């Protein structure tokens, strides 16, 4: 957004408003991400591009999303715009990469709607492969812009190792990974002794990543479906099918 002096700012919305509270540094965020966002702000001014204004629906850049692979160091930058038209696109991306050579992929996400949702449904890859990878519990995971992935991988590894300990898989179990996202915990279970793993996720892009992750890790005893996990499990129960272990991360209301 713009402050009262018409300077470009970035931060978070004040509660129940569209007023942006400037944030230049976040103690729990990766420092490289903070620096990239500062650079994007400067480039907007250099290229005479305006930030999006939620009240008027005008302006170019709505959000900046930065994702970083904890173990790989790969960095994704997603520029969320209100229009598919990106003036001086190649020069803008080139200037960003010159300042931050650690960036491995840049995407433009197009979100033209008057909505509080951050990401739209259309994406263009401007640089790199369009995704990053990270390693967790001995598996490599592909992460796209819209795919869920735990933001604290150190604690995630502790959580998943504990879940595997509780599951005590012996090689005979059918495991359901409900709301599976990119298939992280399900694929770890598949590698750690499950007979078969079934992952269910409503986000189509996340399911694509889960399937790619199974291939990437040469895991053949896992399959993934794009569906509402709650409805899918009700249908499974109605058909008389059973699972030995159900994994939900995070746990959902009604699961007890």
Regions inferred by a protein language model and the residue ranges of each:
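Rossmann-like S-adenosyl-L-methionine
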Residues: 88-256
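SAM-dependent transferase fold signal centered on methyltransferase-like domains
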Residues: 1-124, 136, 161, 165-172, ...
């Amino acid at each position: 957004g713009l402050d009262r002096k018409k300077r470009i700012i970035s931060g978070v919305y004040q509660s129940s408003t569209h007023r942006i509270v400037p944030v230049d540094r976040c103690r729990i965020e990766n420092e490289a991400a903070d620096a990239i966002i500062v650079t994007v702000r400067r480039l907007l001014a250099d290229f005479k591009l305006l930030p999006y204004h939620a009240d008027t629906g005008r302006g170019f850049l709505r959000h900046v999303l930065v994702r970083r692979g904890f173990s790989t160091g790969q960095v994704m930058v997603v520029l969320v715009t209100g229009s598919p038209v990106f003036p001086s696109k190649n020069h803008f991306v080139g200037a960003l990469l010159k300042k931050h050579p650690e960036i491995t992929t840049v995407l433009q996400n197009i979100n033209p709607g008057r909505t509080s949702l951050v990401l739209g449904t259309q994406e263009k890859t401007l640089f790199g492969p369009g995704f990053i990878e990270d390693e967790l519990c001995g598996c490599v995971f592909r992460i796209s812009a819209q795919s869920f992935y735990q933001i604290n991988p150190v604690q995630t590894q502790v959580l998943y190792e504990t879940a595997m300990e509780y599951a005590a898989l012996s090689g005979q179990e059918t495991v359901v990974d409900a709301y599976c996202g990119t298939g992280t915990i399900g694929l770890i279970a598949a590698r750690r002794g499950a007979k078969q793993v079934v992952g269910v996720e409503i986000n189509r892009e996340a399911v694509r990543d889960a399937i790619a992750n199974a291939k990437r890790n040469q895991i053949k005893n896992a399959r993934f479906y794009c569906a509402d996990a709650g409805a899918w499990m009700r249908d499974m129960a109605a058909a008389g099918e059973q699972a030995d272990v159900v994994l939900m991360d995070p746990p959902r209301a009604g699961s007890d």
